[in-house]
From Swiss-Prot:
Major location category of this protein: nucleus
A Pfam family annotated for this UniProt entry: Ku_C
Name of the protein described by the UniProt record: ATP-dependent DNA helicase 2 subunit 1
MF term (GO), any: damaged DNA binding
Organism the protein comes from: Drosophila melanogaster
Length: 631
């Protein structure tokens, strides 16, 4: 995060610039645009390298169509011999086309026909690219400065308001012109035009051992207005992955969650902004389609106001429509109706602006490594609202790093939200040699906002009058509540692991709309296991190994009499015993009459009750008759 280093900052307090212009807030409205420029020299090393570059752009097209179809994307081929017009030739009416450049796709929103057109082009690119576009003669080098001018003109005349425009130049040539030529100096002068227009220029090398020294190191530093020594050679493979995912290193604007003021003390504050570490993978919006033509049903919320007649009837005297913001709430107070408009309601809800207040500092060891509440956010300064915020922020960050301290703050992240206790943990940008995952580039020097699950970290601070100390809990209650917090479960949504359900949904959408199948890897792209092992090693000492539990011997269960199973064996009943009435009564009491034979049951009925039953009577009927006579 070198952008808020005081050594690289412009002295805003010197009065060299208009203070009103500096303090004016940046306009965050607009669209993102990315213009792909593919060097035709890629075909000289074999058509496989050109296909690899086009496949990267194909992945970016598909991801843009599925995730955010409002971004503008264009495609230009540079250093070509021929300049065939694009499919929409009228889009270049107001643009001056230089030689050795061909516009395949002007800056447009991604739609299904555009992606289908690109896929059809890729189907025959192996045999048709050399004939349709060719390579610039005699040495395959066109005018680099004219190509940059074409890109700037296309971005300016795209017809949309842009807030983040990028030019991605895909090549394997280390310099567009010889260093002793006039075209080389003219190309370097175009870097100042990019810096003035605030357009980002990125080189995407198609070879891993790409050399930036001859030309692109100086060109990129001039376009970004940084020192030549501050340039760091990026990883070529990492840049190709970034391009396919369309998450470039400088894209902090899309991930910004809000801007707020950080109050350090009386009459001392600075403006900051906070972000998510990673974007959530948004599912496509649910829509309703018509059965006849699969067109999307578009609905619009409308509020209709009806006024009835005063005579008490249900007849409507007047009816009109209002906007959603023009509605109101009505409550009956006494005999009068009190009307509260939405504007008045929002003013009551928005009494407090998002802000953060510093409470104190604690040692870093007092913060547990794992917090069972919610994912952390990332914070760094914003010099647009309060001048000098970057300098003050860096001073606080450096002091916390040196003293190994964390800042305990009260944070209200957005309007109408509940203030939360948070800890600001200073973090440093990882070295390129330590982590080769390109997602680490999204995080730099700054503070990590860790949400605290309980208030134990602010227990021994001076809370003054605004927080009553009588509400504090003793240590036993805090430990008990910590155990409760650890039992809570939250949805684990790591964006570094592919969501199999989302991949399946996207594959089905692509198969339905573009009629081609995709390889869904599912959970194959897991995190680096070595990084996981390092984190697990820190947690292993907290676990205890118990002795193996002895499994008790299983007892043989008795057989059940249900489901046709045989019951326990009983002694045979002698006929002499049946002559005794007391013995028969005991059999009936123990419900053991079923153990007698049918002949014995007939003998009991005839001998003791003088009842004769038919010989064909079933055993159950005989038992029921004996039980009835006993009653």
């Amino acid at each position: 995060m070198s952008t808020w280093n005081p050594e690289n900052d412009v002295d805003l307090l010197s009065g060299s610039e208009d203070e009103e212009d500096v303090s004016m807030k940046r306009d965050y409205h607009g669209r993102e645009a990315i213009l792909f420029v593919v060097d035709a020299n890629l075909q000289t090393a074999g058509v496989e390298r050109l296909l690899e570059a086009l496949n990267i752009i194909r992945t970016a097209f598909i991801s843009g169509l599925l995730v955010n179809d409002k971004d503008l994307i264009g495609l230009i081929f540079a250093n070509t011999k021929h300049s065939p017009p694009p499919l929409e030739a009228s889009a270049l009416d107001n643009i001056v086309m230089p030689d050795n450049c061909a516009v395949f796709l002007p800056l447009r929103q991604l739609t299904k026909p555009i992606v289908e057109h690109y896929l059809e082009f890729m189907g025959g690119v192996e045999t048709q690219f050399a004939d349709v576009y060719g390579l610039a003669e005699p040495d395959g080098r066109g005018r680099f400065d004219l190509m940059i001018r074409l890109c700037i003109e296309m971005l300016e005349k795209c017809g949309k308001k842009l807030n983040n425009a990028k030019i991605a130049y895909v090549t394997d040539v280390r310099e567009p012109h010889p260093s002793n030529s006039n075209h080389f100096q003219a190309a370097l002068q175009k870097a100042s035009d990019l810096e003035g227009k605030e357009f980002e220029f990125h080189v995407i090398p198609m070879v891993d051992d790409f050399d930036y020294e001859p030309f692109y190191k100086e060109f990129i530093t001039l376009s970004r207005a940084i020192e030549l020594d501050a340039f760091q050679v990026p990883d070529a493979q990492m840049l190709r992955e970034i391009l396919s995912d369309r998450k470039l290193k400088q894209d902090f604007l899309r991930r910004c969650l809000g801007h707020f003021s950080f109050y350090l003390g009386p009459n001392l504050s600075m403006s900051v902004q906070y972000y998510n570490y990673f974007q959530r993978r948004a599912y496509p919006r649910k829509v309703q389609i018509l059965r006849r033509d699969n067109s999307v049903v578009r609905t619009k919320r409308v509020i209709t106001v009806q006024k009835q007649k005063d005579d008490g009837s249900q007849d409507i005297e007047h009816e009109y429509q209002i906007k959603v913001t023009g509605g109101w709430y009505t409550c009956n107070v006494g005999e009068r109706d009190l009307r509260i408009s939405m504007d008045q309601l929002n003013r009551v809800r928005n009494l407090h602006k998002p802000q953060m207040m510093l409470l104190g500092f604690k040692h870093r060891s007092s913060l547990p490594e794992v917090s069972y509440i919610k994912p952390a956010n990332f914070m760094y300064p914003d010099d647009q609202s309060i001048i000098g915020s970057k300098r003050l922020f860096r001073a606080l960050w450096e002091r916390c790093l040196v003293r190994d301290k964390i800042a305990i703050c009260l944070f209200m992240c957005k309007r109408k939200s509940i203030p939360r206790y948070v800890a600001l943990v200073p973090v440093e940008a990882p070295d390129n040699g330590e982590d080769k995952n390109y997602r680490s580039l999204l995080c730099g020097d700054g503070f990590k906002i860790v949400y605290l699950p309980e208030a134990k970290h602010i227990r021994h601070l001076d809370l003054q009058d605004w927080n009553n100390t009588e509400n504090t809990a003793d240590e036993q209650k805090v430990e008990f509540f910590q155990k409760i917090i650890k039992k809570l479960r939250v949805d684990y949504q790591p964006n570094l692991i592919n969501d199999p359900s989302l991949d399946a949904l996207q594959a089905n959408l692509l198969a339905l709309s573009l009629d081609f199948s995709t390889d869904t890897k599912g959970l194959d792209n897991l995190l680096d296991t070595s990084q996981q092992d390092k984190r697990i090693e820190k947690l292993l000492p907290d676990y205890e190994m118990f002795a193996p539990e002895a499994e008790p011997h299983k007892k043989r269960a008795a057989k059940s009499t249900t489901a046709g199973a045989s019951g326990p064996k009983m002694a045979k009943i002698d006929d002499d015993q049946l002559k005794e009435f007391e013995f028969v009564k005991s059999l009936n009491k123990d419900e053991a009459l079923t153990s007698c034979t049918a002949a014995q049951l007939h003998f009991i009925l005839q001998h003791h009750f003088d009842v004769t039953m038919p010989k064909s009577s079933k055993k159950a009927k005989l038992v029921a008759k004996i039980e009835e006579l006993h009653k």
